[in-house]
């Protein structure tokens, strides 16, 4: 949000909403409507009159677990274009092929990643794993697979869940520590090595972690559509999967003084800050807006 305000090409007006929004007041003073996301989460239940405006509507794509219920809002909210950091193939696995979509990377607020602890001053012999994990107990997996076969937490975070069980991994849930939101880099700077793992698609952690100067072990598979984010194995990160993750961790832990880890971490930091910063994302969003008006 701050990056949109900083962008010289945009004159942004934030609209505070209640349960319903009268969109008629936007007529005549708005070129583009940008929606927080295409779901009821964080949005008004009704955008009254939005279809009468003849103003382009762009929406950030909601969490994939809400995609099925969000499809009906495409017509109801008259959405012209979608964006997020997902690959186009992943988006169209979830939504109809005629829904227009653009991949736009964002998530690194550059100022939050400045002056962090140097790589060699960080914890070496432990690996950080943070974020939600699933319940891997047999009965729980069966119940969750019946209720929500694909998008339950365990199926979305299989490798992350497995990593949390390793005795050399420090695991913390997202909201069970003091380093949430803008303070997350202050947790990351404690560790040389961290884990970014998601079953179906790379998420914001994949670039926040290297941006903080961490050697980032990234789950990267055909299943999770990860290649589009541009990181390279053994150059800007270390790729892992369910078959090799322990081997990759042991390679690092058995040789923590090897200078190549710092080199990969530094390369990853430079790549993440250059390609995933919020100002670049805002500029790409401005490009999309320009195309539609």
Name these PLM-found stretches.
Residues 1-49, 53-208, 215-229, 279:
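Nucleotide-sugar donor-binding catalytic core of glycosyltransferases
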Residues 24-26, 187, 248-252, 288:
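CheY-like receiver
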Residues 198, 237, 257, 270:
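Generic anion/oxyanion-binding catalytic loop in active/binding sites
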Residues 206, 214, 240-241, 261, ...:
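Active-site/pore-lining binding-face segments in mid-to-C-terminal subdomains
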Residues 233-240:
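A short acidic/histidine/glycine-rich donor-binding loop in glycosyltransferase catalytic cores
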Residues 241-260:
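C-terminal "capping" alpha-helix adjacent to the active site of nucleotide-linked donor transferases
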Residues 258-290:
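A charged, aromatic-enriched C-terminal amphipathic alpha-helix characteristic of glycosyltransferases
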